[in-house]
């Protein structure tokens, strides 16, 4: 079942996030609450009460202090920023990621960044129609900036 993130999901989401720091930035409960408040989309795939995965997107006019978000805002007039998407290791290869990406808008470009060393994610996003549109070095890590054009 796909549904909105609820307060009761926060512990599971934070656990998933903190166990994926090789691919996403760190979050604490306060950060997550603020992010969900600013989001235009904050959803989970719920499998019998277990958060199998989640996605959080932000509108282009969000008040969001992120160099990666600003990189897109400085270059594109219209986009949705995919801040993070994580699938639980217990639910990989079950179509959870595909379900989350199916929920992304198709009529607006979707922008995201992937760490340069994350070959699996880069390959996955290219297969979904995302293309490389630049790079940004942030805290010593090279972020590959990717965009999926509107359909």
Task: Walk through the language-model features, giving the residues of each.
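Active-site rim helix/loop that mediates acceptor-substrate recognition in acyltransferases
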Residues: 22-48, 62
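Glycine-rich acetyl-CoA-binding "A-motif" of GNAT/NAT acetyltransferases
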Residues: 50-53, 120
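Conserved acetyl-CoA-binding loop-helix of GNAT-fold acetyltransferases
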Residues: 87-106, 123-127
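Conserved GNAT acetyl-CoA-binding A-motif
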Residues: 101, 106-118
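C-terminal "cap" of GNAT-fold acetyltransferases
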Residues: 135-151
């Amino acid at each position: 079942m796909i549904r909105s993130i609820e307060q009761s999901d926060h512990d599971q989401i934070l656990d998933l996030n903190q166990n994926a720091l090789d691919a996403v930035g760190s979050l604490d409960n306060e950060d997550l609450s603020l992010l969900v408040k600013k989001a235009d989309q904050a959803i989970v795939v719920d499998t019998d009460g277990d958060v199998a995965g989640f996605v959080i997107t932000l509108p282009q006019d969000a008040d969001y202090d992120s160099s990666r978000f600003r990189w897109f805002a400085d270059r594109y007039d219209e986009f949705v920023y995919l801040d993070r998407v994580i699938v639980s290791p217990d639910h990989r290869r079950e179509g959870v990621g595909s379900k989350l990406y199916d929920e992304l808008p198709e009529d607006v470009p979707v922008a995201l960044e992937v760490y340069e060393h994350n070959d699996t994610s880069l390959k996955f996003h290219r297969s979904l129609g995302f293309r490389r549109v630049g790079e940004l070095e942030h805290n010593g890590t090279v972020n590959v900036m990717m965009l999926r054009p509107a359909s």
